[in-house]
Amino acid sequence: MRRIETMKGLFFCLGMVVFMLLGSVSPMNNEGKALMAIKASFSNVANMLLDWDDVHNHDFCSWRGVFCDNVSLNVVSLNLSNLNLGGEISSALGDLMNLQSIDLQGNKLGGQIPDEIGNCVSLAYVDFSTNLLFGDIPFSISKLKQLEFLNLKNNQLTGPIPATLTQIPNLKTLDLARNQLTGEIPRLLYWNEVLQYLGLRGNMLTGTLSPDMCQLTGLWYFDVRGNNLTGTIPESIGNCTSFEILDVSYNQITGVIPYNIGFLQVATLSLQGNKLTGRIPEVIGLMQALAVLDLSDNELTGPIPPILGNLSFTGKLYLHGNKLTGQIPPELGNMSRLSYLQLNDNELVGKIPPELGKLEQLFELNLANNNLVGLIPSNISSCAALNQFNVHGNFLSGAVPLEFRNLGSLTYLNLSSNSFKGKIPAELGHIINLDTLDLSGNNFSGSIPLTLGDLEHLLILNLSRNHLNGTLPAEFGNLRSIQIIDVSFNFLAGVIPTELGQLQNINSLILNNNKIHGKIPDQLTNCFSLANLNISFNNLSGIIPPMKNFTRFSPASFFGNPFLCGNWVGSICGPSLPKSQVFTRVAVICMVLGFITLICMIFIAVYKSKQQKPVLKGSSKQPEGSTKLVILHMDMAIHTFDDIMRVTENLDEKYIIGYGASSTVYKCTSKTSRPIAIKRIYNQYPSNFREFETELETIGSIRHRNIVSLHGYALSPFGNLLFYDYMENGSLWDLLHGPGKKVKLDWETRLKIAVGAAQGLAYLHHDCTPRIIHRDIKSSNILLDGNFEARLSDFGIAKSIPATKTYASTYVLGTIGYIDPEYARTSRLNEKSDIYSFGIVLLELLTGKKAVDNEANLHQMILSKADDNTVMEAVDAEVSVTCMDSGHIKKTFQLALLCTKRNPLERPTMQEVSRVLLSLVPSPPPKKLPSPAKVQEGEERRESHSSDTTTPQWFVQFREDISKSSL
């Protein structure tokens, strides 16, 4: 009997086990089928969802992006963000009944949001942003009573905002920005007591701003920018005391700004781009929490209230594009944290108040297109951080303050269309970071200062419509970055300098309406980027160079020069000459050619008679007129100078592989050795040979896997030549921005490049004795070998410095877009200057954009996007598609902006930077580096799912951190 009882017990236990197994297997199978149906509706899944395989891997809880409950084994979270997935969202999504979170952002999913999503009643988090979804927002979403976060921004959704969204009791974040939604904002939405974030910008919404908007007692973010809202700002706006960001800009809102707006406690108030009228309420001056006040592009009238000077925490004040009158209040000089002041395009009168010189953090001052008179106050030069100064289109007079030479951070100076007079100060040539100088439309006289040729970062130079005389400086040939030169409508004489032929980046050369004479230099045909040439109405003579790149210019470019001849001006040069002149010209040409031939033969004979021998390191013998070849590493000893010249055919142009601001780079390939890169420096004779050689020997002693080795150098009649390792994949600049880029850089490769460059720079800063500062970190100075290992280059211009000192640069001052503003202001150099530049390189790697492009500054763009919570929109598509963890991208953005903090003391060291980047490298590292074009197949990564990198609160904190530290 006892045995029977025992057997019954065993059968009961066995039955319970079977029941539990069946109970657990069944839902797994159902959810597994749902996941496979979801996969089937996607495209571009080949390399992304390899482990989603119900044949070889039944454990779907281990599939990529799938997270299950530890007890029930039900799918509770699905994260397939930023995988470049196409196709549609399957209706099988509704079969995942226990789903609590789904993130499909950053893909290319089309189609409609399936109604079946309403079956996932446990959903608390939904992010379908940045896809190609279209159609209406399904009403079934209102069934999701647990939903707290709904992000559908950056799609193509149409139709109205469903009023049923108001039935979701726990909804805290609703972001529908940048779609094509129409209709009005449902009034019931304003009665959701828990709603904290409402983003509706960039749609086609109509209606008015409801007085009920202030019923949202928990709302801190209200953004309806860029819609078609009409009506007025409700008087009850002052009751919206929970608002921190209020943006109703770029709508059709009319009327006056209500007085009650002064009761708000917002940090950002954006009303720009509407049709607001009336005066600026003085009560705004009492809004002490304001960091950004933007009332621009309206129809506001009256004076600027002096009480705005009380806004001591405001960093940005935009009042441009209105009809404001009166004078600029001196009280604005009390806004101690002001970085941006834009008062342009108004009707302001009077003088520029000297009190503005107290704004030590001022970055941009724009007073253009007003009716200002008088002088520019000299103490504007006290604004040490000033980067852009624009007073175009006023009635200012007098001379340009000589103190402007102290504005080391200034990159944009526009004094055009005023009544300035006197000579152009030579001191302007000391503002080393200028990229735009516009003095056109004034009464400047005298000659053009030769010092302007020292502005090596200058992109635009406009001196037109003045009373300048003298000649066009030959020093303009040093403006290696220049794109536009306009000196038209002056009284310039002399000839066109042949040195202008050195300007490889020039796009427009405008010299018309002067008194320039002589011939058009043939050297201008070397300016291959030249697209606009105007030399009309001068006294030029001779033949227009018959080169192909001159055929692009219209005949009008040459009109008004009666002694010019050529097909372009309808005057054929040759046939009209008398026979005697033809004979004389032929005779002269023959004699000149004969003389040149004789000189060449003598030179060749002398050159052949001298056998060049390498000089070992340390030797000081250097015969006059001979070549000195210095070997720094023995692997260079197999080369002789004659060999190098023979292989490169005396540095023929066809061996050129790159240009720099101060050098040309050639490739030398020998059958008996590996290729080397030859850098030919423009400045052939440094002032101190011994110092020059000592620096090169110091640099040549550096051996590190992330630093390009200097193997030797030569002082020769061909110039000063430096011999480096040849890097197969060129520079990072070439791969990111070059016109012929052949590979795509995935995130893993970019991270590898960043780590390598950081380790190389950390070695220079911390492991060299004396320590070494690079001074010109930029993407074009980060070279890549065949395995995309980064190596820092251009150490021919670096300097070693004592461990307790900093060094003020006298050779190279960096490159525009990468220059540390503090270095530009003080000319004092330390490691923090390199760290700033490295931060810009990180931004290039993340965004794929140039540091400076068409006057747009990458760093400023990212800071602006940080203010708007849109930083991640700047990420390069090749990064977002191949990075498995978007948190790594965000951390790298943070690191880049820490490196570029305005205060150098707040920047990390390169050792710290290197450690952070290394922490982002997958562990253990893959055995084989994937090609840059694709992610290694079969590689498995677990994706971070922490709330600190996925919630909007992270973006808010990110914005606040950056705003506090960088603005």
UniProtKB/Swiss-Prot annotation:
Q: InterPro entries, alphabetically?
A: Kinase-like_dom_sf, Leu-rich_rpt, Leu-rich_rpt_typical-subtyp, LRR_dom_sf, LRR_N_plant-typ, Plant_LRR-RLKs, Prot_kinase_dom, Protein_kinase_ATP_BS
Top EC class of this enzyme = transferase
Q: According to its UniProt record, in which tissues is this protein expressed?
A: Mostly expressed in developing organs, including bud clusters, flowers, siliques and young rosettes. Also detected in mature aboveground organs, such as leaves, stems and pedicels, but barely in roots.
What UniProt keywords apply to this chain's record, in alphabetical order?
A: ATP-binding, Glycoprotein, Kinase, Leucine-rich repeat, Membrane, Nucleotide-binding, Phosphoprotein, Receptor, Repeat, Serine/threonine-protein kinase, Signal, Transferase, Transmembrane, Transmembrane helix
What's this protein's function?
A: Receptor kinase that regulates inflorescence architecture and organ shape as well as stomatal patterning, including density and clustering, together with ERL1 and ER.
**Which residues take part in binding ATP?**
657-665, 679
Residues modified to Phosphotyrosine: 724, 763, 818
Enumerate the Gene Ontology biological process terms.
embryo sac development; plant ovule development; stomatal complex morphogenesis
Query: What is the name listed in the Swiss-Prot or TrEMBL entry for this protein?
Result: LRR receptor-like serine/threonine-protein kinase ERL2
User: Could you tell me which species this protein originates from?
Assistant: Arabidopsis thaliana
Q: Which reaction does it catalyse?
A: L-seryl-[protein] + ATP = O-phospho-L-seryl-[protein] + ADP + H(+); L-threonyl-[protein] + ATP = O-phospho-L-threonyl-[protein] + ADP + H(+)
Stretches the record annotates as Disordered: 921-955
Phosphothreonine, modified sites: 640, 648, 826
Q: Which domain of life is it from?
A: Eukaryota
Q: Name one matching Pfam family.
A: LRR_1
Question: Which residue spans traverse the membrane?
Answer: 586-606
Q: Give ranges for the Cytoplasmic compartment.
A: 607-967
Q: List GO molecular-function terms, semicolon-separated.
A: ATP binding; identical protein binding; protein serine kinase activity; protein serine/threonine kinase activity
